[in-house]
């Protein structure tokens, strides 16, 4: 199982990459896609909306289960990955390239929900 050291993570199995412009790119971890199984559907429900850290932003469905995807920080959901919506199984094969949405953090947003790769590895017992 892959857990890249250059990303941040949430306890709810999202990975987070900070871009040069300060926006955050969000996807689900390798561990999450393994637990879900074959992913068949993805939809961002809050595109263009301002959300609070921990709010449900999207849903991802597999042949086994449906799972909510949460905002890692407070901010505005500025983009959804339409390529993943068209081919959701790409999350199974390339979870760290198949990002789900981008969020522009609010000016007062904290990243206290985010943990590093070592802490995430421990949290999943890997």
UniProtKB/Swiss-Prot annotation:
Keywords attached to this entry: Lipoyl
Cofactor binding description: Binds 1 lipoyl cofactor covalently.
Cross-referenced Pfam families: GCV_H
GO term, biological process aspect, one: glycine decarboxylation via glycine cleavage system
Modified residues (N6-lipoyllysine): 64
Cofactor(s) required, per the database record: (R)-lipoate
Boundaries of every Lipoyl-binding domain copy: 23-104
Cellular component, GO, one term: cytosol
Highest taxon, organism lineage: Bacteria
Assembly mode: The glycine cleavage system is composed of four proteins: P, T, L and H.
Annotated family: Belongs to the GcvH family.
Function noted in UniProt: The glycine cleavage system catalyzes the degradation of glycine. The H protein shuttles the methylamine group of glycine from the P protein to the T protein.
HAMAP family given in the database record: GcvH (MF_00272)
Name of the protein in its database record: Glycine cleavage system H protein
Organism: Paraburkholderia phytofirmans (strain DSM 17436 / LMG 22146 / PsJN)
């Amino acid at each position: 199982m892959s857990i890249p050291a250059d990303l941040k993570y949430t306890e709810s199995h999202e990975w987070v990459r900070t871009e040069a412009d300060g926006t955050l790119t969000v996807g689900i971890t390798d561990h999450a896609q393994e637990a879900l199984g074959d992913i068949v559907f993805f939809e961002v429900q809050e595109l263009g909306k301002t959300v609070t850290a921990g709010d449900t932003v999207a849903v991802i469905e597999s042949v086994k289960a449906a799972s909510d995807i949460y905002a890692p920080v407070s901010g505005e959901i500025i983009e959804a990955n339409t390529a993943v919506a068209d081919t959701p199984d790409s999350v199974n094969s390339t979870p760290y390239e198949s990002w789900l949405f981008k969020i522009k953090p609010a000016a007062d947003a904290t990243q206290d929900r985010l943990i590093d790769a070592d802490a995430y590895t421990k949290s999943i017992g890997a």
